[in-house]
A protein has these predicted regions:
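Catalytic active-site module of serine/aspartate enzymes centered on a nucleophile-bearing elbow/loop
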Residues: 127-163
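Hydrophobic "lid"/C-terminal helical patch
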Residues: 46, 82, 121, 148, ...
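Conserved alpha/beta-hydrolase "acid-adjacent" motif
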Residues: 111-117
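Conserved hydrophobic packing residues within short motifs/helices of P-loop NTPase cores
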Residues: 12, 103-105, 131
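Short beta-strand/loop motif that positions the catalytic acidic residue
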Residues: 98, 104-106, 110
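Flexible "cap/lid" loop of the alpha/beta hydrolase fold
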Residues: 2-39
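Conserved alpha/beta-hydrolase catalytic His-Asp/Glu region
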Residues: 22-26, 39-96
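Active-site-adjacent alpha-helix of alpha/beta-hydrolase-fold enzymes
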Residues: 119-128
Length: 163
């Protein structure tokens, strides 16, 4: 999007990290170390971070499905990718080049891709809009699907109408 904004009608950034503080960096590094040692525990912990307890209780099949998808991941490749995620540093000069109507969203209760991160990201992308998904965690696109889809659809429709 920073190189080819002219090719886009709009951009949606959902559940993204931005400018982790030192505590947040330690937390994701710790998650990496746990994932290296204890695969099942890290998957269950991740799902509880991504979905509310109430949703998990009411939707055990969805929980099982997502867990089984995580189980199918190649563990060595997951660790390699997660190391990149842990060590990622934001490039503000690149981000500031984004010049398209941008919607930035995250769940109200997302502890990894926090509302504060999303708000701060929206401050450096010219003309962007931030929307916090009420009661959402990291997988609010599943748990709060109707809300997320309406927000996305309205944003896309508005921006497609302008072209």
């Amino acid at each position: 999007a920073s190189k080819y904004s002219e090719r886009l009608c709009s951009l949606i950034i959902h559940g993204s990290i931005y400018k982790r503080d030192d505590t947040q960096k330690r937390v994701v590094l710790n998650r990496l170390n746990v994932a290296k040692m204890n695969r099942p525990t890290s998957k269950h912990t991740a799902l509880r971070r991504w979905l509310s307890e109430d949703f998990i209780k009411k939707n055990p099949e969805i929980y099982k499905t997502i867990y089984s998808l995580l189980e199918k991941n190649d563990h060595k490749n997951f660790i390699k990718i997660y190391e990149i995620f842990v060590n990622y540093e934001d490039d503000d000069s690149m981000i500031k080049k984004i010049n398209v109507n941008t919607l930035i969203t995250t769940g109200e209760n997302d502890v990894g891709s926090t509302p504060e991160m999303a708000r701060n990201l929206s401050k450096i992308i010219k003309g962007s809009k931030f929307v916090e998904i009420k009661n959402g965690k990291h997988l609010c696109s599943i748990e709060c699907a109707d809300d997320v889809n309406i927000i996305f659809k309205n944003f896309i429709d508005k921006n497609n109408a302008q072209t």
